[in-house]
Amino acid sequence: MRLYNSRILNPHQSIFILVLQCLITIVTSHQEVLFDLSKVGSDLKWDQVSLRHDRDDVWMEETWRNPAATDEKHANQRAYVTCNYDMINPSNWLFSHFIEVKTARRIYIELLFNTRDCDAYLNPKSCKETFSVYLKQFKTSRPGSTKIEKERFSEDIDNWKNIGRLARSNSNMTTETLGMEIDSDTKTIRIAFEEQGICLSLLNVKIYYRICDEFTDQLVYFRPQVTGPKETDMVRMNGSCIPNASKKIPGVDLIGLCMSTGSGIKTSGECVCDSGYSQIADSNGARCESCPTNTYKPKGQSLCKSCPSNSISSEAASSCRCLNGYFRAEDELISMPCTQPPSRPIKLVANAITATSTRLSWNEPSSLGGRPEIWYEVKCSGRGECGTVVMTPGDKKLSTRSVQINGLRPSSDYTFLVFAKNKVSAQFPEFSEKNAVIDIRTRSEEEDVPPVSHLRVDASQSDGITIAWSVSDSDVSDFEVEVRPAIVKKRTFETRHVNMTYTTFIGLNPETVYQFRVRIRDDLRWSQPISYQLGRGLMSSPSSNEVEESQFLNQTGSALLIIIALILIVIAVALCMIVVQKKSKNRKQMSDLDVLDTYKQDSMTPDYHTTSRHHHHQGNLPATLHEQLRSTTKLNAPLIPSFGSPISQPPPYYGGVHPNSGKYKTYVDPTTYEDPYQALIEFTFDISPNDVFITQVIGGGEFGDVCLGGLSKNSPAAAKWSVSNTTMGRGGGGGGYESEPYETVAIKTLKSGSSAKAKAEFLTEATIMGQFSHPNVIRLIGVVTSAEPVMIVAEYMANGSLDQFLRNTDQRGEKVHWEKITEMLYGIASGMKYLTDMGYVHRVSFLRDLAARNVLLDMELRCKIADFGLSRGVRSEGSSVEPEYTTNGGKIPVRWTAPEAITHRKFTPSSDVWSFGVVIWEVCSFGERPYWDWTNQKVISEVMIGYRLPPPMDCPMGLYRIAQWCWKMERHERPTFTQLLATFHKYILQPTLIEHDPGELPRRVQSQSALNTYGSVNVGVVPTPPSSAAPMPSLDDFLRQIGLNHVYGQLVSNNIHSVSDLANTSHLDLLAYGLMSAECSTVRDGLNGRISGSPPGSSGTIHATTRGTRTTRPPREEGFFV
C-alpha cells in the first residue's frame, strides 16, 4: 500500500488496515461528481466511429423515463442505444466529451445499462453479450481538436486504455463501477465505449472521485482530503486542535488516515480544552466553551467547577483567586478553599508565678480561620531582661496551650506575647496584631515559697513505702520524684514522673538509707528532702551526700541485728501462711466467681496512675536498684481487688514478686493505665533502632508487616534476652550461629501514618507480651519506639504455626509419632496453665484465641502460645478461617469457643479448656479445620444440642478421651490445666497409655430419620435421645431454637401441636400452611438434628421409599453426642 504524498506503507500491512477500519471510529465519505448523464437535459451529440463499416449512426441518442428518479425534472433522462448483431464483425465506438478531473487522483465510472441475450435472435451474423470501456488522460484542459476522426483514431487507438469489459449480471438493469488511477499531471479525460455486435442500452454514465469529509475526533479537527490513486492507498491527514484547545501530550502529532473508500479515521494524538474552557458536545463532535464567572477549570478533560469557598473568578478562568483577607497555603491545590490565619488566643493567664519562673496557659482562639492545624509561638518582649528566659517545651511551633517559663529574675516585670498561627499566617500582612499579651511581675526571693511542701511518708510495709506531698497550686499534676541512697561514695539517683501527689517504692533494701525529694516538673525548685530506712523510719538528713566510708560501716553494723530479726519474723510469717493455705485449699478461687461482674472488677482496680522512667544517669546505679524501684502501686490499695491485681496474690504484692521468689508475677491489665505509654515503659525493653534490622517480609497483619530480622548480639536487649534464655531454656528457632554478630528475631512493624489509636493498640500487645516469661509462651525481646516504623521484636519461631506445620508434614507423608504429639500438647497446656496462674484476664476484649494457628513451633518443635493482639479484623472470605462470630462485646472464634462464652459472654479458665480440647482435635487430625465447612450458626446450634467432633482417623483414644473431657457442657466438670498436665505427663512417661481409652466413651448415635422425596421426615417411633442430651422440647421451644417462633400460630391453626406432629408433615403441607420454602428447609434441618442426632442439614443415613420413590443411600456423616 502507498501512503500518498507522505510515507510509504508496507503492502503486507493490509490486515492491519482492515482492523483499523473495524475498530476505530470511521467518518462517512463524500463523492465529488465530475459528470452525471442523468443530470444532462440537452442533446449530448457524442462522437462515434465505426472502424469496420462506413456508418456514423450506430449509436443512437434517445430519451427514457427513469422510474427511480428523485424528482420529476430529471425523470426523463438521455441514453445511448445500439443493436448491430446483423453486422459482420463490427467495432463501433462512442466517445464522451472532455471531462475535467479537478483534484481527483482516482476516478470511478458508474454505468447503468441493459443488454439482450444472443439466443433471442434466430440467425445473427455477429452477436456479442459484452462491451468494453476505455479511458484516455490529457495533460491540458482544452485539447486542440475535440472531433474524433476515423483515420486519426485508428492510429491513436493504442493510447486509449481498456479499463473494463462488462456484461449483464441480471435480467433487469445492471450497475457496474470501474475505478481508474489518474496521473498527477492529468487535467481532462475522455471515456469511450466499444460494442462488437451487442444490443446495448447505455442508460447512465456517472463519473466521480471520493473525498474524506472533514471531521472532529477528541477535539482534533481534520480537513477534507481526496483519496489516493490506488485502491489500497491511505492518505495521511494532518489534524489540528479546535479553537481553545491544545495537544494533550506535547510532541505527539495529530494524524489521521483517509482510506480509499472515502472514510477518515484518527490514528494518533488527542487534544484537551485549555485552562478556563470546558468540553461541550455539539453536532460537529465537541467544542471548548469558556467557563462562566465564578467557575474555573485547569487544563484537562474535566468540567468547569464552582470556585471553592472564599474565592472568585472571571470568565474563562483557570483558577479562582482568594477574597481579600483569605489565602491558600503554598502546598495547597487550587481546589482547596481559601482560609484565614486564626484569631488571637483568648484567656491568657499566668499561673504559679515565682521569683524565677511562671507557667502561661491560654485557650484556643475563637476562630481557627477555617483550617484544621494550629500552633502557637511565645515571645518575651518589651519589659524585662529576656536574654536569660528559657521556655519549655519551647517558644516555636507549640502544639500545647501552655508553656513553662524559667530563668526569670526576682522582682522583675516581663511582657509576653502569644501568637496563634497556621499555614497561611505568613501571608497575612497584619499578623503582628494577632496576639495575646500579658504583663507579669515575679516575686521577690523573700516571698517565694517552694510549690511542693510537706513531703512525708504516707504508708510503709516490710519492703516498701508510699510517700506523699502537698502543693500550693491544686491544678498542678505533673511531678518529678528523685530517690537516691543517702550514704554512698558515688552520686547515683533515679527519677520518675508521676501525675498524683503520692508514689510508691517497693523492693527497698533494709540496709540502705534512701533520700527522697519532689519538685514540679520543669520547675527547678526541689522540696526539702527526707531520708528513710526500712525498719527505722525517718532519718535525719546527712549534712552532705558524701560522707566518710567509716560512717557507712558503723550504720551497717547496727543494721545487721535488724536483718537477723527480720529473717526470723519472715520465717514465722511463712509458716503461718502455709497453715492458712492448707485450710483454704478447697476454697473457690476469685477468678471462678460468677457473681463478680466485669463492671465491678473495673471499679475495684487499684491505682495505676504513676509512671517510672529511668533517668539518663541510671547507668551508674547498682544493678539491683532498678529492680527495687519498679512498683507504681499505692500501698493502701483496695481491700477487695480485681482478679490479677497485685494485692490479690500472696505477698509480696507490689505489682510483682521478688526476682528470686520463683513465683509467677500477676498479670496487669494495660487498659487500667491512664497513659498506655506508662505501661509500655514498665513492662517492655526499649531497643535502639541501630541494634535491629529487617531482612525480609514473611507475612502481614492488620497493623503492618511481620518480618524476619536480626538483633545485634552486642546490644543491651540481646544481652538481656540471653540471660532469660539461659534461665528458662533457649527460645526461638533461629538464634543465629555463634560466629554471627546478630540474633535472628521476628519483627512486627506498624504501618507508617497509622492513627494514634492503632499505635496504642499495637503497643498494648507488646505490653501484654512483656509480662510473660515462660518456655511455652512467646517471648518479647523489646520494642522500638524512637524511630519509624514502630516495631515489636520477639523471638523467631522457625517452624511457623502449628496447624500449617502439621498440614505440611501430612502432605509430605512424614510421620510424627504420637509421643511427640503428646509432648506438643503438654507444652501448650503448660503455657496455658502459666497464663491462668498469671491471672491473664478472661474478658472478650482480651480473649485468648487459643487455636492451632496461634501456637508457634521453634526448631526443637517446642510449642509456644502467641498472638496477644487486642484488635483482630474480620478475616476476608478468601482466608482459610471463617470470620469470627460477632456480638456486642467483640468477635468470637466460634469453632474454638465454649458454649457459655458464646451465649452468656462468660470467659473463665474453663472456657480456655474447651478451646484446648479443639486444639487437641486439630493436632490429632493434622491441621484439619474443626467442624469442616459448617456455618457458624450451624456449629453453635449443633454444639448446644450435644454434638461433638468425632475422633480423627488413627487418633489414639487416650488423646480423644481428653478432648471429650474438655468438651463437657457443664464447665465445672471440665479438667483444669493442672489436671491436663498431669495426664499428659503420665502419657509421656508411659507411651503405651496413649493408645488406651482410660474411660467409657459416650455412645455413638446413628441417624434414624428418613426423608422422602418431598422433604418430610418419616419417623415411626421417636428415638430416645442420648442420656446427656436435652429432652424432646415442646413445639414452641423447638421453633424458638431454630429461630422460627413466628410461625407457631400458623402450625397450631393447622392441628400441629408437637414436634412429632411436625416431623410427620410433608414439605408440601408446610408450604400450604403458609411457610416459605427457606423456612421449610430450616424446619427439616432442625428435625434432622433433634431426632437423628446428626447435624442439621446433613444427609440422613437411610432415605425410606415412600410414594413410589426409589431408595438412596448417601454418604453417612457421623458424630458424637454427649
UniProtKB/Swiss-Prot annotation:
Q: Report the PTM annotation.
A: Autophosphorylated.
According to UniProt, the tissues expressing it are described as: During ventral enclosure of the epidermis, expression is seen in clusters of presumptive head neuronal cells and several cells in the tail region. Early larvae show expression in the nerve ring and ventral nerve cord. Strong expression is also seen in the procorpus and terminal bulb of the pharynx. Expression in the nervous system is seen through to adulthood. Expressed in Z2/Z3 germline precursor cells and in oocytes (at protein level). Expressed in the vulva and in the spermatheca with accumulation in the apical regions of the organ. Expressed in oocytes and sheath cells.
- Topology of the protein relative to the lipid bilayer: Single-pass type I membrane protein
Q: What subunit structure does UniProt give? A: Interacts (via kinase domain) with daf-18 (via C-terminus); the interaction is independent of vab-1 kinase activity.
Its lineage reads: Eukaryota, Metazoa, Ecdysozoa, Nematoda, Chromadorea
Activity control, per UniProt: Dephosphorylated by daf-18.
Task: State where ATP binds.
Answer: 698-706, 748
Q: Name one GO molecular function term.
A: ATP binding
Q: Which InterPro entries match?
A: EPH_SAM, Eph_TM, Ephrin_rcpt_lig-bd_dom, Ephrin_rcpt_TKs, FN3_dom, FN3_sf, Galactose-bd-like_sf, Growth_fac_rcpt_cys_sf
Residues covered by the Fibronectin type-III domain: 341-445, 451-537
The primary gene name is vab-1
Changing residue 63 to I has the effect of:
In e699; most die as larvae. Animals lay an increased number of unfertilized oocytes compared to wild-type. Reduced brood size. No effect on major sperm protein (MSP) binding
UniProt protein name: Ephrin receptor 1
Q: Which residues form the signal peptide?
A: 1-29
- Span list, region Disordered: 1091-1122
Q: Where in the cell is it found?
A: Cell membrane
- Check the record and name the SUPFAM superfamilies matching this protein: Fibronectin type III, Galactose-binding domain-like, Growth factor receptor domain, Protein kinase-like (PK-like)
